[in-house]
């Protein structure tokens, strides 16, 4: 049985322990003075910190430490005791090594924009539950990653190593990785073992490296059975890669390479692919049937390629016309031959492909235009057209009309130049149409991708005003009917016409700018008689005035004899005027005196010569230093010329 005294002792002990533990609990939940804490989120970012502050609450889950100056020494050892922290943002700091003393259960670590050079097993093994590792914009190289550094990172799903110094893909990556970003490195070769075993990889980004077809190993991507997105943008490929994983690949990006051919089996079995981008390459044609296995394709981007619309591309026209409405194809615009430059491949008729076995004869007719002097209603203002290559023998016909075959829906086009940079397009339709596609491009310059300008006009309209064109330049204008489903009619041929904008001198020949731009100076043989007479009178007047001025200047000394240059007459200009008069005397300077001697024997008038003191410029001292003990009666400037104030006359 416990005595009352012992019971009181135990109660007092418990109370004392409570008051001792309570302050520790309060301290544990306190927030560092330089940070802001909000329900597990600790905001210590953008504070110019050099170390992680102490006293972070134990219930913290996310640490925002970015945009500081924290270095490796500034990471305290007690940081690893924060067992609830799952996300740490340490990007844009001063780390030069992979940080240690991190919480064990961290899942997301942002270390981009530091100067980290090495990745070691010791640093990664202490955070085995890491799922996302961001190491973009550091100095990691292939040799600085320790072999087996990731062998305990069994939960790693995202690894970002963009903009580092990698020359190859790091080996020994965990099988759990789902997204791997290696863009903007120096990778030139990828061997099959590099990606071996990454069966969970879904997204692989290799943009901006040094990869070519020789640097890609055979079937290097074939075993990536779960890969859904592959990006090889901005590399040096000359052919589309083959042996791609066909079971899951949905997006393939190949733009900005040097691809000039596509192997016939490049896209075989890619039945899940729905987006393919091969823009900005050197493709001129495509092998027939290259897209046959693309059952789910919905976005095909082929912009900025020098497509040659010859007989080899006729199958592409047929394939485009058979596509359903949901398929969006962009960039199949002819760049050659000359007669179809700037036209969409799907708009071409069969005879325009110049197939030798084709017996189709063109039914496009060109008739003389009927001038239309009526000014058009307010039109639209399209974007400027990119310049096109020179045409050796252009046959440009102004204000002409073009019609289609009588068996087709006839369109009669009339084009008239309104101003040097504006043309008026009008048309008449034989049958009602829902909409028409109107396109125009400039001829006569080097080929440029995406050169044609297009717009859709409704069937109710009958005219269009095109502005912002170049004066005195040839243009091709085409129209083709469209249906409401946005698909071209299979039996419609584009109706085209060539015209030329008016020269500038037809509208404003008197401005200086236009005269400078004209090849020959502006001439007007019909000058008014009054203008000729006025010009002659002006020339005679100018000649007489010049003669009078010359005579006054030549005989100015005669007038000077009747004038006395005294102190009361424009004192400030005496020296300036004296410098312009003819002087017939010589100033002789002897040892301590000077004398004016006339050249001729004519007597010198006393009042005709007056000597004035010439005031020196600012900063020049003409006075003798009173402190000097020299006995000379002359003081010198820097140039050694005797000072006139101390000369004897």
Swiss-Prot record:
Residues covered by the LRRCT domain: 305-356
Induction: Up-regulated by FGF2.
Keywords of the record: Cell adhesion, Cell junction, Cell membrane, Cell projection, Developmental protein, Disulfide bond, Endoplasmic reticulum, Glycoprotein, Leucine-rich repeat, Membrane, Repeat, Secreted, Signal, Synapse, Transmembrane, Transmembrane helix
Matching Gene3D superfamilies: Ribonuclease Inhibitor
Membrane topology type: Single-pass membrane protein
Disordered: annotated span: 629-649
Sequence ranges on the Extracellular membrane side: 29-528
Main location: membrane
Glycosylation (residues): 282
The record's account of how the chain is modified after translation: N-glycosylated. Proteolytic cleavage in the juxtamembrane region gives rise to a soluble ectodomain. Cleavage is probably effected by a metalloprotease.
Any one GO cellular component localisation term in the record: synaptic membrane
Transmembrane segments: 529-549
Effect of residue 183 to N: Abolishes homooligomerization and FLRT3-mediated cell-cell adhesion
Domain LRRNT: from-to ranges: 30-62
Assembly description: Monomer and homodimer. Self-associates (via leucine-rich repeats), giving rise to homooligomers. Interacts with FGFR1. Interacts (via extracellular domain) with ADGRL1/LPHN1 and LPHN2 (via olfactomedin-like domain). Interacts (via extracellular domain) with ADGRL3 (via olfactomedin-like domain). Interacts (via extracellular domain) with UNC5B (via Ig domain). May also interact (via extracellular domain) with UNC5A and UNC5C. Interacts (via extracellular domain) with UNC5D (via extracellular domain).
Protein name per the record: Leucine-rich repeat transmembrane protein FLRT3
Species: Mus musculus (Mouse)
Gene: Flrt3
């Amino acid at each position: 049985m416990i005595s009352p005294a012992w019971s009181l002792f135990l109660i007092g002990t418990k109370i004392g322990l409570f008051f001792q533990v309570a302050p520790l609990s309060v301290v544990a939940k306190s927030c560092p003075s330089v940070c802001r804490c909000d329900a597990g989120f600790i905001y210590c970012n953008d504070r110019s910190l050099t170390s992680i502050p102490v006293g972070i609450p134990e219930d913290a889950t996310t640490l925002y430490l970015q945009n500081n100056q924290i270095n490796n020494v500034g990471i305290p050892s007690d940081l690893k005791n924060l067992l609830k922290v799952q996300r740490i943002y340490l990007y844009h700091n001063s780390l030069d090594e992979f940080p240690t003393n991190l919480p064990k259960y961290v899942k997301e670590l942002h270390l981009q924009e530091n100067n980290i050079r090495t990745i070691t097993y010791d640093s990664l093994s202490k955070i085995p539950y890491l799922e996302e590792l961001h190491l973009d914009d550091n100095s990691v190289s292939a040799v600085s990653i320790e072999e087996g550094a990731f062998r305990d990172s069994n939960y790693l799903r995202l690894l970002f190593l963009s903009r580092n110094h990698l020359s190859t893909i790091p080996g020994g990556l965990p099988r759990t990785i789902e997204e791997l970003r290696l863009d903007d490195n120096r990778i030139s070769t990828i061997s099959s073992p590099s990606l071996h075993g990454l069966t969970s990889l879904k997204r692989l980004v290799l943009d901006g490296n040094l990869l070519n077809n020789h640097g890609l190993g055979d079937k290097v991507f074939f075993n990536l059975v779960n890969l859904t997105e592959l990006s090889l943008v901005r590399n040096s490929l000359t052919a589309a890669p083959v042996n791609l994983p066909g079971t899951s690949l949905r997006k393939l990006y190949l733009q900005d390479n040097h691809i000039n051919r596509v192997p016939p089996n490049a896209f075989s079995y890619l039945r899940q692919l729905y987006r393919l981008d091969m823009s900005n390459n050197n493709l001129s044609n495509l092998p027939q049937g290259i897209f046959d296995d693309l059952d789910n394709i919905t976005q095909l981007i082929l912009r900025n390629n020098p497509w040659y619309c010859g007989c080899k591309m006729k199958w592409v026209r047929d394939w485009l016309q058979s596509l359903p409405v949901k398929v969006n194809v962009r960039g199949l615009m002819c760049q050659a031959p000359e007669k179809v430059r700037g036209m969409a491949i799907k708009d071409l008729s069969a005879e325009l492909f110049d197939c030798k076995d084709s017996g189709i004869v063109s039914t496009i007719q060109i008739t003389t235009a009927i001038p239309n002097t009526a000014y058009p209603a307010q039109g639209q203002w399209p974007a400027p057209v990119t310049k096109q290559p020179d045409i050796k023998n252009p046959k440009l016909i102004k204000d002409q009309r073009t019609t289609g075959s009588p068996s087709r829906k006839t369109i009669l086009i009339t084009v008239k130049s309104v101003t040097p940079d504006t043309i008026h397009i009008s048309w008449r339709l034989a049958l009602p149409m829902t909409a028409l596609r109107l396109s125009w491009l400039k001829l006569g310059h080097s080929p440029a991708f995406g050169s044609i300008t297009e717009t859709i006009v409704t069937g109710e309209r009958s005219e269009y005003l095109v502005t912002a064109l170049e004066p005195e330049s040839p243009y091709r204008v085409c129209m083709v009917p469209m249906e409401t489903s946005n698909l071209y009619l299979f039996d419609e041929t584009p109706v085209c016409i060539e015209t030329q904008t008016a020269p500038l001198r037809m509208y404003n020949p008197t401005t200086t700018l236009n005269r400078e731009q004209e090849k020959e100076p502006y001439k007007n043989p019909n000058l008014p008689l009054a203008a000729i007479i006025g010009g002659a009178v002006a020339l005679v007047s100018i000649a007489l005035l010049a003669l009078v001025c010359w005579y006054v200047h030549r005989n100015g000394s005669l007038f000077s004899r009747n004038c006395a240059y005294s102190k009361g007459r424009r004192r400030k200009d005496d020296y300036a005027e004296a410098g312009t008069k003819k002087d017939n005397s010589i100033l002789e300077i002897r040892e301590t005196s000077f004398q004016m001697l006339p050249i001729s024997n004519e007597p010198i008038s006393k009042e005709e010569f007056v000597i004035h003191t010439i005031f020196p410029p600012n900063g020049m001292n003409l006075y003798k230093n009173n402190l000097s003990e020299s006995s000379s009666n002359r003081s010198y400037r820097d140039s050694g010329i005797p000072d006139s104030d101390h000369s004897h006359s």
